Regions:
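Basic, flexible Lys/Arg- and Gly-enriched helix-loop patches that mediate nucleic-acid binding at interfaces
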Residues: 1-231
C-alpha cells in the first residue's frame, strides 16, 4: 500500500493532506525519514508520524452528527469552545470532520477516519449536494429571489453555481448547493436581500438528518457508507 494511503487509512489525515505530511519529513518507516508518498508499506513497516508509531489502519467508519449551534466543526479549538468530536463515542478512533459547518449553524455533519472518502465528499469535482433550511429576514421570499438563487448569484469570490431553491414558508427556504465555499449559503441569501437568521443543514449527499436529535450522533451502516462512496 502507498504510504499516503496507509496514513489516510490510519486516520492521520486525508490522503492529500497525508502527502503534505510525508513531504514535510514528518514520517519515518523503520526509523528512516521518508518523503515519497508513493513508498510501499504494510502493517509490518513500523510507520511513525512525528515520532508516534502507528498501529496500522483502523477500521474505517463514518458517523453522522446533528451539530448544535455553538459547537465548532474542527478536531480541536484554540479558544476552548466545544467541538464536534465531543459528540461522538468512537472507542479511541481518530476521527475528523468531513468539511465544515459554521459554529452559528446547526445540522448534519459527517465525521470519519477514512481520508479517501472524506476527500471524495469534499472535492469540488464530485459536486456532492448539501441541503439546508434557512430562516431569513428581508420580508417574504419572492419567486424572483428564488429564481436568482437557482441561476446563481454574484459573490465576492465569484458567481455561485446554480442551486436548488424552494420556498417552505414566507421566510423559510430550502437550498441545495454542490459547492462548499466559506459561509456560502449565508452569502447567497444575503445577495438576494434575505439575510439568514437561522441555518440548518438537513442533507449531505443521500443522507438526511431524519430524526437525529440535536447533539446526538450515530454510526452509518455499511449500506449508507457504500452510497456515499458511489457519489
Amino acid at each position: 500500500m502507498r504510504l499516503a494511503r496507509y496514513l489516510a487509512h490510519a486516520g492521520v489525515a486525508s490522503r492529500r493532506s497525508a502527502e503534505a505530511v510525508i513531504r514535510a519529513g514528518r514520517v519515518t518507516v523503520a526509523g528512516e525519514t521518508v518523503t515519497d508518498p508513493a513508498r510501499d508499506v504494510d502493517e509490518q513497516s513500523a510507520v511513525a508520524v512525528d515520532g508516534r508509531a502507528l498501529d496500522g489502519p483502523e477500521p474505517r467508519v463514518v458517523y453522522a452528527v446533528n451539530k448544535p449551534v455553538g459547537v465548532v466543526s474542527t478536531a480541536r479549538d484554540t479558544h476552548g469552545r466545544p467541538t464536534v468530536l465531543g459528540l461522538v463515542s468512537a472507542a479511541g478512533l481518530r476521527l475528523y470532520p468531513v468539511g465544515r459547518l459554521d459554529a452559528d449553524s446547526s445540522g448534519l455533519l459527517l465525521l470519519t477516519n477514512d481520508g479517501e472518502l472524506a476527500n471524495r465528499l469534499t472535492h469540488p469535482s464530485f459536486e456532492v449536494p448539501k441541503t439546508y433550511i434557512a430562516t431569513v429576514g428581508g420580508g417574504s421570499v419572492s419567486e424572483r429571489a428564488l429564481a436568482a438563487l437557482r441561476r446563481g448569484v454574484q459573490l465576492d469570490d465569484g458567481p455561485s453555481a446554480p442551486a436548488g431553491a424552494r420556498r417552505l414558508a414566507q421566510n423559510r427556504i430550502e437550498l441545495t448547493i454542490r459547492e462548499g465555499r466559506n459561509r456560502q449559503v449565508r452569502r447567497m441569501c444575503a445577495a438576494v436581500g434575505h439575510p439568514v437568521i437561522e441555518l440548518t443543514r438537513v442533507g449531505f449527499g443521500p443522507l438526511r438528518l431524519d430524526g437525529l436529535r440535536e447533539g446526538a450522533s450515530r454510526r452509518l451502516s455499511v449500506a449508507e457508507v457504500e452510497r456515499l462512496r458511489a457519489l
